[in-house]
Amino acid sequence: MNFLKLKNIILKLENIIIFNKETLKNKNNSSYIFRLSKIKFLLTVCLIPIFIFLLKKKMNKIKIYKNNYVSNNTFNYLKDDNEFLKKLKIILKEEELFENELMSKHTTFRIGGPAKYFVKPKTIKQIKKIINLCNEYNLKYFVLGNGSNLLVSDIGYLGVIIQIKGDNFSNLKVIKDDENNYTILVGAGMPMRALSIESCLLSLTGLEDVVDIPGTIGGGIIMNVSFRGTGLSKSLIKVKVITPEGKIKELSKKECGLYHRGSKLKDMKYIVVEAVFKLKKGDQMIIQKTMTDNTKNRYKKQPMYFGSAGCFFIWNHTENGSLYKKYKESNLVSYRVGNIMIYTYNISFIVNLGKGTASEVIEIVEYITKIMKEKYNIEMKREVIVIGTINGIDYF
């Protein structure tokens, strides 16, 4: 039994035994009220020890996780923390460094506990130094763009979150090759929507389909995002990356190893800092119409008012058939745990109805995975990246 189930039981019991004032006024029998109080007292006595037991169990899991984290990463929080922070403050200005920053503020899922360190570097040089520092202390790090396609643990992230976003990583340079062809150099922190609109204003075609994909250029390339079959990869020429060793490399599109909903860049943990695209001159009215149609389609099918991380699973319709049909047969449409639900109007999405948790998301994900394997022998592969420890499992 988890906290959510226990909470639901308590709420149901309260609904049964607790009456409003008007109801109590109408009950003149004092013995009836006494029996009601006695039942409530007995239930409380029984349930409180169970709640305390589960709480202790959960706290032990967190302690075990922290101990494992220190031993596996050789980062001693008592000894190395102050020293690491001092060196981090040399690299970054005060407004670029945050401690215990809530990740729910930085993800489209609106879920996530505090990151030990949250940094917003403004130069490639700073990023390199931060990575080298993390390597020196063997402290894990994760690179964040717009926070889409990401689920962060409720207890947070015991490492460094590096956000590549904002004006310093949104530079745009347009080079005219000839009358019909243009080269676009863009920073990895520019939102895909912004680049799509800029291209339209210049009457350049090739990036219409990313107009309403949340996320930055860097994240979009690494995850190889697309809408209706096309995305950034169609016009991509090359990228500039920082390797896990802190070195800068230039890679061609082929070297990026792009595949459906992923890339070699993701597998190798490369950080994209710049990208080069080739776009063609087009009719601005046609480009604008395509973008408008894309926006209408996305608003019809996708949860615009709930927190989500986009499509949660990678699904091959050609190989596996209709996902909706399988969900319908398995009673998974609108399946809900707490404040997390499979979106009714597009079952590819798992949405946060308000105060959802990462634990609730994983509970749904594990249930879907189990059902799809047992009933259809299909291995469900996550598209969304999960970081931190959830329900005792360390994801990243």
Predicted features along the sequence, with ranges:
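Phosphate/pyrophosphate- and phosphate-bearing ligand-binding catalytic cores of soluble enzymes
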Residues: F98, N146, L150, I242-E366, ...
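Structural signature of FAD isoalloxazine-binding scaffolds in flavoprotein oxidoreductases
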Residues: G112, F118-I124, L151-S170, I222-K253, ...
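N-terminal, positively charged, Ser/Thr/Ala/Gly-biased leader segments
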Residues: F53-L144
